[in-house]
């Protein structure tokens, strides 16, 4: 897998945003939380992830390159809020009242759980399966489990075992 190069100006914009919201939080909370580590190794359709114990934020490089400033403005404070909530309150619901409070009252940004970025470029290939009543799209992970005989999947409507038909031409 090749690594995408994130232009230095975009990395600087990420860090500027991170530092802005971290400063807001430290002032509001009366704390001196350190700057989290940022890396650009998030894969799939997730825009970002917060690694609580290592105080690290992973950002999706493809979605960052495609969406630039809107991505930074939405995803960086979202993931930072997860880290701050963990430091402030310990283990709580990921998008619970503490996280919403951190987003809205401390960081002063809307508390949105999911992003609305176009994900066609990062969506994984799916595999068509069918039962008696409909078609189903399985991820490559589930498809491979079927091929190895580790799992079988059944339709929630009719209960029939799903049968492989074709690969989706994504």
Swiss-Prot record:
Residues 22-165 form the SprT-like domain. Disulfide bonds: none annotated. Pfam families: SprT-like, Zn_ribbon_SprT. Its main location: cytoplasm. Zn(2+) binds at residues 78, 82. GO terms for biological process: response to stress. Its cofactor is Zn(2+). The keyword Zinc applies. InterPro entries: SprT-like_domain, SprT_Zn_ribbon, Uncharacterised_SprT. Belongs to the SprT family. PANTHER family: PROTEIN SPRT. This is Protein SprT. It comes from Yersinia pseudotuberculosis serotype O:1b (strain IP 31758). The gene is sprT.
